[in-house]
């Protein structure tokens, strides 16, 4: 059987950092429950697994939450623009070649980043390598069936290389004990066309396509958000 064609999401954090920031602001403004960073920070703190490596840390949302709780955290990102907002210690590096020795970290977080890789397994292998045998790995991704209210209007594209459908099995190739927390609920309330356009911008929809979608959608609009948070302990081999 031929494997389904998938594509990595193009990274634009240096060429268009405001797109990323707009997406974060839209989530903060319109989500009913916020994002995963708070519960992830709370669990990592509760389990006392340090130091923590925040892979693809962006502008440090998870990292800053953990440091506010007194945790030792290192941020790693391959975007100089994103990393400029992150306090030390931080590392400018590719997540497929993590510049730390084997078993160095008590926890590794890779939130909303594995779908940027043509082969996410390279990052999963590196995460396993730098994690202690009793350590904890956590990642997350949206579903390919996210935002069903707009499914017929958004530009079509192949599934991402890592999503909530294929992600758990891929993580299980490297880690033995997997927990999957899925979400599937009406979680994002967009009150008007301006909010919809802002969310579309953050979602990576081009200006022309965003205006086309907005012209066909009545607001207020509630979007169903689907995805998964994946926790992994230990090693599978």
Model-derived regions, located:
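Class I SAM-dependent methyltransferase SAM/SAH-binding core
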Residues: 51-97
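Short catalytic micro-motifs in class I SAM-dependent methyltransferases
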Residues: 112-116
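A short glycine-rich, Lys/Arg-flanked "PGG" loop and its adjoining helix->strand segment in the class I
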Residues: 121-133
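A conserved beta-strand element that flanks and buttresses the S-adenosyl-L-methionine
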Residues: 109
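Conserved Class I S-adenosyl-L-methionine
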Residues: 33, 59-61, 159-162, 172-237
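Conserved class I S-adenosyl-L-methionine
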Residues: 1-47, 61, 136-162
């Amino acid at each position: 059987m031929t494997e389904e064609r998938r594509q990595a999401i193009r990274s634009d954090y240096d060429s268009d950092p405001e797109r990323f920031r707009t997406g974060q602001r839209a989530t903060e403004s319109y989500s009913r429950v916020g994002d995963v960073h708070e519960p992830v920070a709370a669990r990592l703190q509760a389990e006392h697994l340090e130091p923590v490596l925040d892979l693809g840390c962006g502008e440090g949302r998870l990292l800053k939450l953990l440091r506010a709780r007194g945790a030792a955290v290192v941020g790693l990102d391959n975007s100089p623009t994103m990393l400029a907002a992150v306090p030390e210690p931080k590392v400018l590096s590719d997540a497929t070649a993590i510049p730390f020795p084997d078993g160095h970290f008590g926890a590794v977080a890779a939130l909303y980043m594995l779908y940027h890789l043509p082969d996410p397994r390279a990052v999963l292998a590196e995460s396993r390598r730098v994690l202690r045998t009793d350590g904890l790995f956590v990642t997350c991704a949206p579903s390919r069936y996210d935002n069903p209210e707009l499914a017929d209007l958004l530009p079509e594209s192949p599934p991402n290389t890592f999503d909530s459908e294929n992600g758990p099995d891929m993580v299980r190739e490297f880690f033995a004990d997997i927990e999957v927390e899925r979400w599937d609920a009406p979680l994002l309330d967009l009150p008007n066309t301006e909010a919809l356009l802002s969310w579309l911008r953050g979602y990576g929809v081009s200006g022309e396509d965003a205006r086309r979608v907005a012209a066909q959608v009545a607001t207020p609009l509630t979007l169903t958000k689907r995805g998964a948070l994946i926790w992994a302990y230990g090693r599978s081999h």
